[in-house]
Design a protein with these regions (language model features):
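Short amphipathic alpha-helix with an adjacent loop that forms part of the alpha/beta core around
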Residues: 26, 74-75
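Local sequence-structure signature of Cys/Sec-based thiol-disulfide redox active-site neighborhoods
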Residues: 13-57
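Non-catalytic, surface beta->alpha helical segment in thiol-disulfide oxidoreductase systems
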Residues: 85-123
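Thiol-based oxidoreductase modules, predominantly thioredoxin-like and allied folds used
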Residues: 39-44, 56-70, 77
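Boundary of Sec targeting at the N-terminus
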Residues: 9-11
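Extracytoplasmic/secreted cell-surface and envelope-processing proteins
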Residues: 46-49, 71, 93-95
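Structural micro-motif
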Residues: 75-87
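N-terminal signal peptide c-region/cleavage motif recognized by signal peptidases
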Residues: 3-5
Length: 123
């Protein structure tokens, strides 16, 4: 049997109990990842959730706003989806859905923001 290691990231779920640990980018296993994408998601609007997360090469986490009222309040989430790029625990950029509740950002825009954050952190 041939096994091929996967270097990509999978979409995970977070809630009020672990969101801060995830956003900080610190791993218990010593594999720190400073950039993290968090999507504040709502079941009623699943059709408009960001669907290309498998194409992003950094951790991608969803937070169910119905189950995470503290995180929703702290990050001022009013609409879902709201997507935030964090860099070492700090908000780098936020994309918020409008009244149409459509996903507010494209894969290309997220990739560009990640590239800019990576370049800025090199200095």
């Amino acid at each position: 049997m041939l096994t091929i290691p996967c270097l990509g990231f999978s979409q995970e779920w977070a809630d009020d109990s672990n969101i801060e640990d995830i956003i900080s980018g610190k791993s218990a296993f010593g594999e720190d990842e400073p950039l993290v994408i968090v999507e504040f998601w709502a079941k009623f609007n699943d059709a408009n959730a960001f669907s290309d997360w498998e194409s992003i090469n950094i951790p991608y986490v969803r937070v169910d706003i119905a189950k995470s009222p503290e995180a929703k309040k702290k990050y001022r989430v009013r609409m879902a989806p709201t997507i935030i790029l964090f860099n070492e625990g700090f908000k780098e950029i936020t994309w918020k859905a409008g009244l149409d509740l459509e996903c507010p950002v494209t894969l290309q825009e997220i990739k560009e923001a990640i590239e800019e954050a990576n370049q800025a952190s090199q200095f």
